[in-house]
Amino acid sequence: ELKSDQWKHRKLSQSWVKYLSFSLEKYHREKNENIYAFPSKLDLKEKLGIKQSEFLFDISVGLYKSFKSKKFESSKKVLPIYYQSKPIWQIESELAENTREIAIDFSKLLAGNADYAMMVSPEGKEKRDYYMDEMKKMLESNVSLGRKILYFLILPHPRDWVNKKREWSLHNWDNNDWKKVKKGEWIIKEK
């Protein structure tokens, strides 16, 4: 069965989000085994009783703690109940070139409480400049980011990922404007 281009792009984007989440989880778990990511490579349903694959953000990495359930609940056993005690990363990825969704996702990041937040959006010079200018306006009207370190990652649209060399760029908010901190290229070879 042939799949639409839109379906393929969505699957590529979802795979990329999972890869980034798994990489962040691996990096942080080397420092503390109580750090988990959503989505996770680990079986969190079996390990922690957590069934969802997303926790408020496309990617959420945080420190988890637990408390004991009470016997008066429906469960016959006293089980630990896990909760995120300290968010570390909150990431939103909107590669569908939908300005409304990018603004909604960026607003979620501004409302979040992680030390690190990142918005991922599609490239294209005009689009990139437009998105960054509009997000800058949102930041200028925001009272305070506190200690939050905010990144903006510009990636090619998934339609341009396979068999094409493409550039990406990472920008950091310096309380005044977006500053490019890193750039690179990638190419995904079709099998």
Residue ranges: model-predicted function:
Residues Y116-P122:
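Short hydrophobic alpha-helical runs that function as membrane-insertion/retention elements
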Residues K125-E190:
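Domain-level recognition of nuclease-like catalytic cores that cleave nucleotide substrates
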Residues L12, S53, S66, K76-L79, ...:
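Polar low-complexity intrinsically disordered regions
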Residues E1-S69:
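Acidic-basic catalytic patches of nuclease active cores, encompassing PD-(D/E)XK
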Residues K70-F72, A96-K108, K125-Y131:
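Active-site-adjacent loop/helix micro-motif of nuclease/hydrolase catalytic cores
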Residues I59, S85-L95:
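Conserved catalytic cores of phosphodiester-cleaving nucleases, focusing on short active-site segments
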Residues S107-A114, K136-E140:
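Short, surface-exposed basic-aromatic patches at helix termini and helix-loop junctions that form
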Residues Y19, E54, K86, R100-K108, ...:
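Short, well-structured alpha-helical interface segments that form or flank functional binding sites
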